[in-house]
Every structure is written in structure tokens, then in C-alpha cells.
Amino acid sequence: MKALLRSLTPPILYKAMHDAKMLLPRATKYRIGEHVIAIPADHNLPIFQEAHRLYDRFLPVLCSQFPATGVIVDVGANVGDTVAAIMQTCANRIVAIEGHLPYFDILRANLEAIDPQHRVTPLNALVGTGAKAGTLVAHRGTATLDASGSGAMQSLDALLAQWRERVLLIKVDTDGFDADVLLSGTATLKASQPLLFWEGGTTGARSFASMYDTIAATGYECFWVFDNFGNLMQSECGTKVLKDFDRYVESLYNHRCTGSISYVDVLASTPKTMPIARAAIEKYRRENIEI
């Protein structure tokens, strides 16, 4: 998935930056606002954010609109780059879940450096319904599920059972398995009606379509769609638009069609959280996009 995004980065820029990174030690440092975190030397985040100014910039804006009470959940927390960004714009507790042990070790070390108040709880777990199993394999800053492995899944509901605070946001980035992650948390979705943010438009169009129907029955009726560079494409649309995007992106993978979008990010809201979502979108337009 990230390979398509990489192909849209100017080749000369990508090669120069990547070659420079390969001269660095196996771990390097990257600044995210006030925090400096450790990342693998081959991690693609610095390249993408250098080339695309809106890449991974929305979530800190969204979290800045949250009340001080309530939990944020990051599934696919990687080495803690998203956590490092959002903890600077809100006061909430954060649950950071990462299934790939080498990334989890870096995540935990980063939290020791940037989270002296222990607001963030790191969990090493593979999240899902159990319909899929495997082992995570890392490549240039992202980890994908290798179905030949035997790693056991834990449901999101089970992992979050110990938290009694309302869940405000569930962010999922698991490279193609986001739908299965969310389907493992339906009790949490019903109880808290959190905002949802996931990476969509993958080869799993059918599993996503099933997930859309499930969350729609829980009250999720309004969606915002961002392209893979972080720019807003659709506001307050319905599930039909999401299904159309999924089929479009699936055609790039399965039918060798030419395209400019390799995936989309989706924000989902119930009527309960619409004021927060709308305020965040307006702030993002004003302070990030239209500058």
C-alpha cells in the first residue's frame, strides 16, 4: 500500500532522501513538534512529510477539539509517531496498541522519553475478530500481516474492557485489516460512539463494505474522506461514496489501472460527535489546507 504512495513522491527526491537515510545508523531521531522520537533509519515518515505537507497532520487537529476526559485509542501505533503528535494537542489518556514487537519496543522507549506523566498506555497485541491470523512483517516503517504466521488476535472490546472512561476516538492503521479491527470492537462502538479514523481504499473492499453496514447500524452516518496525502476530498458523505472509493483503489491493485490515489483516510461520526468533527474539519481547512 505504501509502495503506491512512494511511487507518487518525486523519484529524485525519494531516492536522495532514502539514500541519505541509509547512511545513518539503524535507528535515527525525528522531530514531531516539541518531541523527538526514535524511528528506524528506513522509516518513510520523514520522506512523506517532507514531500507532502498535509501527510498525517489531521489527527492532532481533531484531538485538539476533545474534552479533557475520555480515552483515545491508537491501533497500529507503530513507533509512536501519531501518539507523539496528538499528545501535544490534548490532555486525554491514550491507549497505544502495536502488534509488531520490534516497533512496540521502540514505541515503549519513546514513551519513556516523552511521556513522564504516563498518559499513554502501550499494549503489544494483534487486534481483530479472529477471522484472520498471522505475524506482522515490517518494511520501511509499516508492518503488514503475513497470513502464514500463527499470531493470535485479541478483540478490541477485550483490550479496552479495563478502561471505564468513554472512548473518544479509535484510530486504526493496520495496512488492510482496519475493517476487521473495528468489527472486533462493536460493543465499544455502541457504548461510547467514538469518532473513528481508519485507512480505507484497499484490496479488502468486501470486508470494508460489511464493516460500513455494521457501523451504520450503530449510528455512524456521516463520513469525511482524505486522500493519501492528507488533503480533504469529501465532507459529510455516506457509505456509498466510501464503497466507490474502495472499488476505485481496489482496481489499482487488482486490475493494473492507472491512478493517483493509493488509499484514503476516513473519519466517521455519529450525530453525537458531529459538533467535534465539524469543528476539527473547519480548523484543519483554515489552518492547514487553505494557507
Residue ranges of predicted features:
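Short alpha-helix
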Residues: 207-215
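Active-site beta-loop-alpha junctions enriched in small/polar residues
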Residues: 201-203, 228
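Conserved S-adenosyl-L-methionine
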Residues: 123-125, 220-230
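Short internal loop-to-helix segment that lines adenine-nucleotide cofactor pockets
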Residues: 50-73, 117, 121-122, 130-192, ...
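Proline-aspartate-enriched helix->loop->beta-strand connector
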Residues: 194-196
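Short strand-turn motif at the edge of the Rossmann-like AdoMet-binding core
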Residues: 99, 175, 199-201
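Short, conserved loop/helix-junction motifs that constitute active-site signature segments
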Residues: 86-90, 185-192, 215
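S-adenosyl-L-methionine
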Residues: 1-110, 115-121, 147, 160-164, ...
